[in-house]
Amino acid sequence: MKLLILTCLVAVALARPKHPIKHQGLPQEVLNENLLRFFVAPFPEVFGKEKVNELSKDIGSESTEDQAMEDIKQMEAESISSSEEIVPNSVEQKHIQKEDVPSERYLGYLEQLLRLKKYKVPQLEIVPNSAEERLHSMKEGIHAQQKEPMIGVNQELAYFYPELFRQFYQLDAYPSGAWYYVPLGTQYTDAPSFSDIPNPIGSENSEKTTMPLW
């Protein structure tokens, strides 16, 4: 009789679902104790201490497996959300880097302006002498910005660009217009007067000469 009861209980224990139903509001430890009481309390003579320990270990291992599966699912969800946040941040950094780096076209205008200043064009006397130093520093800044992303625009460059190109556009629409201006320091020569022009010299016997008739 005892063997029959034992086999029935073992069959029931093996037939129970691997994922037990979790009652809301009760912790896992309380549920494990209730299961042990349900199987052990009606038959205290059949189950000894060893059986009770084995059953408690089995139930504890199942609960730990469930918790591990839940932890893995949470970690996967967090990794997906973090990867989605990293992608827009990288796109924003590239967009800021493209906006902050000064264009090479402006540097070409600045070099052209400094070349025109060497010819002493009157409209370019306002350009400061430190423009060459600033051009050199701007070039170094661009090389540094290409290696490392730039967070903000340099205030000195932001102030220097509009002033410089406002003076540059006061010239003609193209740089060759500067050649129409007369450089400073040129000496003008006076035009000869009409009194200094020598009179034409003719022969004295021009009135007496006769033209041959054909």
Swiss-Prot record:
Keyword terms, alphabetized: Allergen, Antioxidant, Milk protein, Phosphoprotein, Repeat, Secreted, Signal
Expressed in which tissues: Mammary gland specific. Secreted in milk.
Localisation: Secreted
KW ATP-binding (keyword) present: no
Extra facts: The B variant sequence is shown.
The organism of origin for this protein: Bos taurus
Region (Disordered), start-end ranges: 195-214
GO CC term, one of those recorded: Golgi apparatus
Major site of localization recorded for this protein: secreted
PANTHER family: ALPHA-S1-CASEIN (PTHR10240:SF0)
Entry's family note: Belongs to the alpha-casein family.
GO MF entries: amyloid-beta binding; antioxidant activity
Sequence repeats mapped onto the chain: 85-99, 125-140
GO biological process: negative regulation of supramolecular fiber organization; protein stabilization; response to 11-deoxycorticosterone; response to dehydroepiandrosterone; response to estradiol; response to growth hormone; response to progesterone
Purpose of the protein: Important role in the capacity of milk to transport calcium phosphate. Antioxidant peptide has 2,2-diphenyl-1-picrylhydrazyl (DPPH) radical scavenging activity.
Residues recorded as bearing Phosphoserine in the entry: S56, S61, S63, S79, S81, S82, S83, S90, S130
Signal peptide from the UniProt entry: 1-15
Name of this chain's protein: Alpha-S1-casein
InterPro entries listed in its UniProt record: Alpha-s1_casein, Casein, Casein_CS
